[in-house]
Curated annotation (Swiss-Prot):
This is Conserved oligomeric Golgi complex subunit 6. Acts as a component of the peripheral membrane COG complex that is involved in intra-Golgi protein trafficking. COG is located at the cis-Golgi, and regulates tethering of retrograde intra-Golgi vesicles and possibly a number of other membrane trafficking events. Residues 694-703 have a biased composition (Acidic residues). It is found in: Golgi apparatus membrane. Belongs to the COG6 family. The keyword Coiled coil does not apply. One of its GO terms (cellular component) is Golgi membrane. The keyword Transport applies. Residues 692-742 are annotated as: Disordered. Its main location: Golgi. It is a peripheral membrane protein. Residues 720-742 have a biased composition (Basic and acidic residues).
Length: 742
């Protein structure tokens, strides 16, 4: 019979004890930790059978005692453990509890005994502590006054230590150490960084002391005392620096010793706070260097270098430019060396400026001092240099040598002015010598001009430039070559007053001489204006050719060109008149120009049909024989270009005159019945025959350019030859100078 599991059990089964136990056993859970630990302990109490005891007779069960910390275990036979455990579990557990309690009681009894002993010791220690406290109370009452006194003394000691610390700080801030005092005052300690550090410390003390001076009366008095003491220390330090500088400055007697150490530079920088001491030290330096430089200059003039090299400068006194140039070069080199030495000593911060380069901006204090000292150092050179150069200038008679010396002086004057300034004594001396040299040069140039005008004679038959003009032009060429080597900026040469004065004094007398000679030629030969113009054009052209070599003579060239144009126009007019006479049209043109306004040309004698026919016939014959390129009358002109130009312009005027005659003849108002038959040649035909047709200006420009190019090539060839000669001469002279210097 099947039963439904979901059918509830009958109520009687719930009261059955067996059912209850079964349900209880089934519903009990042993998953909690305490239950599992209890089961593990119980299972440990009843271990399995020992394998070693196998085969031996064992009692039903045996109680085995292990150490105190383990529970007793029962050895059970196979299959009996569960039964024995159920039988003896409660008994075994109670036995274990009893055994454990006994052990606890024994342990606590021993602890109680030890605690009793400890209590006795504590009571004894309490008695001893009470005795000590009693004695301490007695001692405190007996030493109370001493403790109070000790507290007072301790407070006084702390106050004294604080004051001592403050005094130490005050002294360290407002006084110098022994080493610093020694550096300031002792002569045995040399000048160096310790002295400068001590001076800085003194200055700092004086700066800090200003706070004391503005405080209470006592502090102000302390400040005054400190200021007085530090003032003495400062003066002692500056005096020591002053003595050091004076001693060192006296050692600068030779060029090889010119080297300023960093200590020297800093010493001079410190002395700037004492201008009087610095001025006195610098006076020692300037007197020493001035004497040394002067002796070196005199030795260079008379003795030369060590072992005779370089050779003495005065050995070249026979060569003025070499002599003056060597002296000025020595002065310039010495100036550069001295300038570099002084700038290094005074600590001038150089702004990448080369020696001889112009200074820019305002001078600083260091640069101003260096310039002043340099001026005084070189002051001794002024007199011997001036005397020797003046004697050299006075002894010169040649104008070129005088100008070379003057130009050389100008070169070094510009260089020295840029190096040491225009206010320096040496520069002023050079300026004075330079002015005197130019005065002597201009006097010589004036004397040459007067010499040109003193002995005049008429030009020769060739009308070429006279020999005196050629000599003067050669001198002018060399003068301009010397000027071209000067330091004057090429952009400023055109406006240079010295150049304008030179050209005026050199060219003016030459032009005046040529004009006077031309007048003498006109009066002597009776050649009139023609020969005068040819001579003037040749002479002025020669001068113009001399000046064309240089691009800074534009104004003078323009003046000469205007004069040449005037004479060319005069020659063109006269040449045209001569050609007009030779071709037979002169009378006809005079009649056309001077006839009455109301009278036809055919009724006048010179322009009557018969006379005009004869004149035109002569013109036709002349035109077939005339040379359109040149004329024998212009053969004396040295410029082929001008000869062609004058001849072509004259022929052009002949062509224009013939054209005007043609217009008059063909004009019915003039009264010519057969005018066309009278004109044997047309106007264009005449223009072609004379080479001056409608396109003659273009052809003339082309020919003129060709002639100019040819003349320019010839002139360039000649100029290059002349320049080559002058350059070779200068190179030879420079080579000789270099060899002598070497």
């Amino acid at each position: 019979m099947s039963t439904n599991p979901n059918t509830p059990a009958p109520p009687a089964s719930r009261t059955n004890p067996i059912s209850l136990r079964i349900y209880k056993a089934i519903g009990t859970s042993f998953d909690d930790v305490s239950s599992r630990e209890a089961l593990e302990i119980a299972s440990g109490m009843y271990g399995p059978e020992d394998p070693k005891a196998k085969g031996k007779a064992q009692p039903e069960y045996e109680e085995l005692e292990e150490d105190d910390d383990t529970l007793p275990k029962r050895r059970t036979l196979k299959g009996q453990s569960a039964a024995i455990a159920r039988k003896y579990l409660k008994q075994d557990i109670e036995t274990c509890l009893a055994t454990g309690s006994t052990k606890f009681l024994e342990a606590f009894a021993e602890v109680d005994q030890k605690l009793n002993v400890l209590r006795e010791h504590m009571q004894e220690m309490q008695v001893r502590c009470d005795q000590v406290q009693s004695e301490l109370d007695q001692a405190n009452s007996g030493t109370k006054f001493l403790l109070e006194r000790a507290d007072v003394l301790r407070s006084q000691r702390d106050s004294a230590q604080l004051r001592a610390h403050l005094i130490t700080l005050f002294l360290s801030r407002f006084t110098l150490s022994n080493s610093e005092l020694t550096a300031l005052t002792s002569r045995e300690v040399t000048i160096g960084q310790p002295l400068f550090d001590a001076l800085d410390h003194v200055e700092k003390i004086r700066t800090d002391c200003e706070v004391l001076l503005s405080g209470e009366e006592g502090k102000a008095q302390a400040g005054l005392d400190i200021m007085s003491l530090t003032s003495e220390q400062l003066e002692s330090g500056y005096s020591k620096i002053h003595r050091y500088c004076q001693f060192e400055f006296r050692q600068f007697t030779r060029e090889a010793q010119l080297e300023a150490s960093s200590v020297m530079r800093q010493a001079i920088c410190r002395l700037r706070d004492r201008p009087a001491l610095l001025a006195d030290a610098i006076q020692t330096l300037t007197s020493t260097r001035q004497s040394s430089i002067l002796h070196q200059f005199l030795d260079a003039l008379t003795r030369g270098g060590p072992g005779g090299l370089p050779r003495p400068i005065e050995i070249h006194a026979h060569d003025p430019t070499r002599y003056v140039g060597d002296m000025l070069a020595w002065v310039h080199q010495t100036t550069a060396t001295e300038h570099e030495f002084l700038e290094g000593m005074f600590g001038v911060k150089e702004k990448k400026r080369w020696v001889g380069q112009e200074r820019g901006g305002e001078e600083g204090e260091e640069e101003r001092m260096a310039s002043e000292v340099l001026d005084k150092d070189l002051e001794g050179l002024s007199r011997p240099l001036k005397l020797r150069i003046q004697e050299t200038i006075k002894s010169q008679e040649g104008i070129i040598m005088t100008y070379k010396i003057a130009n050389l002086l100008h070169f070094y004057l510009v260089t020295m002015r840029k190096t040491i300034g225009g206010k320096a004594m040496l520069v002023q001396t050079l300026q004075e010598i330079h002015d005197q040299a130019y005065i002597a040069f201009y006097e010589t140039l004036d004397a040459q001009g007067r010499g040109l005008l003193r002995f005049l004679h008429p030009p020769d038959a060739t009308l070429t430039p006279p020999i005196t003009l050629r000599d003067a032009a050669q001198i002018l060429r060399e003068l301009l070559f010397v000027y071209s080597t000067s330091l004057i900026d090429p952009a400023e040469r055109e406006s240079d007053a010295d150049l304008a004065k030179l050209l005026d004094k050199a060219v003016g007398p030459c032009v005046e001489m040529c004009e006077r000679m031309a007048e003498m030629r006109r009066g002597k030969s009776g050649g009139g204006e023609w020969e005068r113009d040819i001579f003037m054009v040749n002479s002025l052209g020669y001068l113009e050719h001399t000046l064309e070599m240089y691009d800074f003579t534009t104004k003078t060239l323009h003046m000469l060109d205007e004069k040449i144009k005037t004479h060319v126009e005069s020659m063109t007019f006269e040449h045209h008149g001569k050609l007009l006479e030779s071709c037979g049209l002169a009378a006809v043109m005079r009649t056309i120009r001077t006839r009455p306004e109301d009278t036809p040309l055919s009724r006048l004698h010179a322009t009557s049909p018969k006379s005009l026919t004869s004149a035109l016939s002569k013109f036709s014959t002349w035109i077939s024989t005339v040379d359109p390129s040149t004329s024998p009358r212009l053969a004396l002109l040295t410029s082929p270009r001008l000869a062609v130009e004058i001849h072509r312009k004259a022929l052009r005027k002949i062509y224009d005159a013939y054209g005007e005659i043609c217009e008059r003849v063909l004009d019915k108002a003039e009264g010519y019945e057969f005018g066309e038959t009278m004109l044997r040649r047309g106007r264009d035909e005449v223009g072609v025959a004379l080479g001056v047709g409608e396109d003659w200006e273009l052809e003339e420009d082309t020919e003129e350019k060709s002639m100019k190019q040819k003349e320019q090539q010839d002139e360039d060839t000649e100029d290059q030859g002349e320049k080559g000669i002058m350059q070779e001469e200068h190179k030879a002279q420079d080579a000789g100078n270099t060899e002598d210097k070497a």
